[in-house]
Amino acid sequence: MIIIKCGIYHLRNDDIQGDVISRYRSYNVRPLAFIFDAYVFSWFWDNMYALLVTIIVLHVLNLYLIYKICEKMGIYLSAFCLCIFALCPILVESIYWISASTRIVFSLFLCLSSIYLLLKSFDEKNDSKKLMFFYSAILLNLMCVGFYEQVIALNLFLFIFLMICLKKYKYIWIPITSTVWIGIWYVYFMMHGEMQARGALNISGMLETTVNCVKMIFTNYINAYSNFIYSLGFGKEAVLSSLVTVFVAILFVAFMIYIYKKEANLGEKSNTTRKIIFAMIWIIVPFLPFIVLDTKFIAVRNLYFCTFGIAVISEMILDLVLSLVKNDNAKNIIKTSILAFICFFFIISNIDGVNNYRKVNSIDEKVTKQIIENVPAEAFSNGKSISINYDANDLFKYKNLSIFVESTIESDWATVGKIQVMRKSTSAPTIYVNSNQDKADYVLYFDGQMNLVKN
């Protein structure tokens, strides 16, 4: 559904801007993220659909790697938590917003691949392959910390926990080395660079920041829940009025059959203590950077990691409740039915996103096209500025009501990315939205129908 939703319509591509495409600046606090933006992900610029499919494949591979790693730890994950993590609507921003997914999903893939290859090296008998797996694991681990602060923390704790479980203590130096090198990089940004706030420590205000982080996490989940419930009505209408009903029905039956067989074979195999600790690492650790570093905002995309941990804990609670059911066959049917219905409603919520994209993207396209057609070409060169002005009420009318999909034209940096995508150009003008009319080189006004009225 994410492919259908995002492949048809233009994606938000805000951070891939002219200065990132054309050159790498040493002041970027996430070193590999900006290198990959400029020299890897920019290759997909003319085919964002291909990039999105790639990200979704990585998301699925992350699920597979988590599953295989957990097997080595004596933790057996059922399809219940894996499917919830795969389809939960709250993860959509982490995936469809390419500037986030290239950091979150991709860096997690590097982290998990590093752990998986190290485990492969333990079992490999051939010496040359053993060394290849081992050194590849080290390289990927050094790379994964260069993309996102949450992955830095998760990589350290997850790796160490795994080595403790397997009693491979001598390999703990691998994540420590990765953390030290990126830590030195961040210390540099406490004193230099345009992004120095991301590298500044917040020791004195940690308690207050912790409380604020908890509030923001709960707020994001509560908002997500309310938007999820709101979107069910629109999603239901889409299902009942289109052929997608057939797709959802087939998927529903497939889940019922597949999950039933999967649950029947797993039984109660997991080391419960390890499973709880493993889940808590995913829930708590990714938020530590927000407490330690001087960052003030937790977005919906930052819930990507902890949602998996919550899915694991939720499954454990459900299993505890279902332990009251004595008949194993009935227990599996109940659990399978619950999962199938959850996935069914998740899909309906995502279907609502398709309609939201139609509405929001059509307005984004309309406004951006008018900007491009009515402003001289030199206005889009670096160093120039454009002030774009809408009536606040009119803009709100076209703004998506769901947190899962955002409008491009409501923010300056996203509008820049939209213009670049439509012009197929790396030039990056400065954009002001409803501000700096006297300062900008060009000033545009739009009416209630989002038509240009004054240039």
What are these regions (language model features)?
Residues 1-455:
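Polytopic membrane enzymes that build or remodel cell-surface glycoconjugates and lipids
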